[in-house]
Amino acid sequence: METRDVLIVGGGVIGCATAYELSQYKLKVTLVEKHHYLAQETSHANSGVIHTGIDPNPHKLTAKYNILGKKLWLNTYFKRLGFPRQKIRTLIVAFNEMEREQLEVLKQRGIANQINLEDIQMLSKEETLKLEPYVNPEIVAGLKIEGSWAIDPVLASKCLALAAQQNKVQICTNTEVTNISKQVDGTYLVWTNNETTPSFKVKKIIDAAGHYADYLAHLAKADDFEQTTRRGQYVVVTNQGELHLNSMVFMVPTIHGKGVIVSPMLDGNFLVGPTALDGVDKEATRYITKDAPCMLTKIGKHMVPSLNINNALISFAGSRPIDKATNDFIIRVAHNDPDFVILGGMKSPGLTAAPAIVREAVRLLNWKLTKKPNWNGKYNLPWI
C-alpha cells in the first residue's frame, strides 16, 4: 500500500483550502469527504460573508484569524481563483438606546481588530436612512462598515478543490472514515466505507471534519476535546423589484452570533437569518423547524418593512461547530499525537478565516516543505 503524506478529513471550505495550500508542495495529499458533493454541511448553509472583523473579541483566535484570513482572500485567493463574489458594505442597525451603545462597543472592537478608521462610521438615524431608505424608520442609529464581501461558499470550496486537484491532490468523495489506527512505524492506517478506496496509509492527518472533528480525534485516540452545535435557519425571499438594498443589514449581535441579517444575495434574492439554537444533535443540524420561516420573515420585515414575506422561496438550515471549552477556534496539534492536526470549533467567522487557518495547519505539520516548480494556483469556475 502506498503511503500518503497527508490525509485531510473533511471537504468543507476549511478542508478544501487546506488541500489547496498543500498542493503547492512536493507532497502526496488526499482529501476525503463523506458526502457525494463537497461543502454540504457548515460551508453549505451559512451567510456567505467575508467579514470585516467587527464582531470577534480581540483576544480570541476568531479575531486573529478573521483579520489574517480576510487579507488572504482579498490579496491572494481572489486574484488566483474565479468564483462568484461581490463587494458589499455591512450596516448594523440599532432600534433603541441600549443597542446604540452596543454599536459604539462594536466600533471600538472593529478598530482593535484593525478595521481602518475611514471604513467604519457611526451614523445618525437620518444618515442611516439616507444610506438605506428601505430600512425600518424606527431605527435610532446605524454602524456602517466598508470592506465586506458576499461569496458563494460552496462554489468557493469547489474552486479550491479543483485547483488542488489540478496540482495532483487526490479528492475522494463518498468516503467516510470508519477507523484510524496508529502503527508502530508512526504512520496511520485509516479505513473508510468506500470500496474503491477502503483504506489509506498516511504520515499525518489534518482533521477538518466540521461537526465531527471531535469524533474523529476520539476515533484516533489523539485528543478528547468536545464540540457542541449551534443550528442556524435561514429563509430566502425572492426579489420582484419592490426592494433595493446596497448593504448587508444586520441587527445588533448577541452572544449567540452576529445577529439576524437581511442581505442581497448574489442571485438577486434576499437572505434572512440565521436563528441560533444550541445543542442540536449532529445528525439534525440540517433540519428545518416549522416556526422558523415565519419567525425569520417577521424579523426580516421588522428590519426592512418592504420585504415581502409572501415571496419566501426556500428555507434551509446549517450549524456551526462550537468548542465547549473555549467557544473559540481550535488550531493545534492533538494533545496525544503531534502527527494529528486539529482544525475544530469552526464557527463564524470560519469562512473568512479559512485561508489563514489552513496556513497555520501547514505550519503545524512541522515539516520542511519543498515547493513544486510547476505549481499552478490559478483556477476559474465558469460563472457569470
Swiss-Prot record:
Residues annotated as binding sn-glycerol 3-phosphate: 47, 51, 258, 320, 348
Database matches in NCBIfam families: glycerol3P_ox_II
Name of the featured protein: Glycerol 3-phosphate oxidase
EC number: 1.1.3.21
PROSITE patterns: PROKAR_LIPOPROTEIN
Active-site feature positions: 51
Reported cofactor(s): FAD
Keyword Cell membrane assigned: yes
Subunit comment: Monomer.
Major localization listed first in the record, in broad terms: cytoplasm
Inactivation phenotype: Cells lacking this gene do not grow at all in glycerol-containing medium, and exhibit a significantly reduced formation of hydrogen peroxide and a severely reduced cytotoxicity.
Recorded name of the encoding gene: glpD
UniProtKB keywords: Cell membrane, Cytoplasm, FAD, Flavoprotein, Glycerol metabolism, Lipoprotein, Membrane, Oxidoreductase, Palmitate, Signal, Virulence
Residues holding FAD: 14, 33, 42-43, 47-49, 177, 346-347, 352
Lipidation (S-diacylglycerol cysteine): 16
Secretion signal span: 1-15
Gene Ontology BP annotations: glycerol catabolic process
Lipidation (N-palmitoyl cysteine): 16
Top EC group: oxidoreductase
InterPro entries according to UniProt: FAD-dep_OxRdtase (IPR006076), FAD/NAD-bd_sf (IPR036188), G3P_Oxidase/Oxidoreductase (IPR052745)
Pathway annotation: Polyol metabolism; glycerol degradation via glycerol kinase pathway; glycerone phosphate from sn-glycerol 3-phosphate (aerobic route): step 1/1
Gene Ontology CC: one annotated term: plasma membrane
Topology with respect to the bilayer: Lipid-anchor
PANTHER family: GLYCEROL 3-PHOSPHATE OXIDASE, GLYCEROL-3-PHOSPHATE DEHYDROGENASE
Catalytic activity of the protein: sn-glycerol 3-phosphate + O2 = dihydroxyacetone phosphate + H2O2
